[in-house]
Amino acid sequence: MKTKKPFFILLSIIFVFINSILYAQIEIPRNLKHAYEKGTRSLDGSPGPNYWQNFSDYTINVLFIPSERKLIGREKIIYNNNSPDILNRIVLRFYQDLFKKGSPREFQVNPSDVHDGVVLKKLFIEGIPVDLNDKSKANQVGTNLNIKLDSSLFIYPKSQTLFEIEWELTIPKFSNVRMGTYDSTSFSLSHIFPKFLD
């Protein structure tokens, strides 16, 4: 009879411990709590009633010169600001700058494939040219070009802005990462065009 009492005490402690774990309140991380309060996220993880997402529509024309392994591109991009915020800067992403001299990369590339990266020739915002040599207007960090907008070109909520760009890119000859050359007539082209972080 005496051996049953410690067993029931131990069983009771285990029962209380398991129930306290099962019914304990899990603390909601601050960033998620803020999203719940703003209505951009629901408690079940789905988008909330105030959820928004920016997006871009691209019209891309590319000339490929196989003998030079060169791409010459023109893009018209309509950027759609669906956020409640006024945007005073925007980021253009150059995925292929992983072959640019000095770019950090997580893999080895053939030294002869390292080049100047995506060469941005022209950038227009609503038809107004951006001085690409002015680092206060367009400053590249890694594979991102940070574009600071003049107040007359701020992107207002629920509005669209037209960006036009011209660029050039050399396809690597020996390193086939995201793109590459297989022989004189076979190429792999992926992530070739500059795009916005939406």
Residue ranges with predicted function:
Residues 1-6, 114:
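Positively charged n-region of N-terminal signal peptides that target proteins for export
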Residues 7-8, 47:
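Generic hydrophobic alpha-helical membrane-segment signal
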Residues 24-198:
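Acidic/His-enriched low-complexity segments
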Residues 1-2, 10-11, 147:
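Generic low-polarity alpha-helical segments
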Residues 9-19:
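Bacterial N-terminal signal peptides
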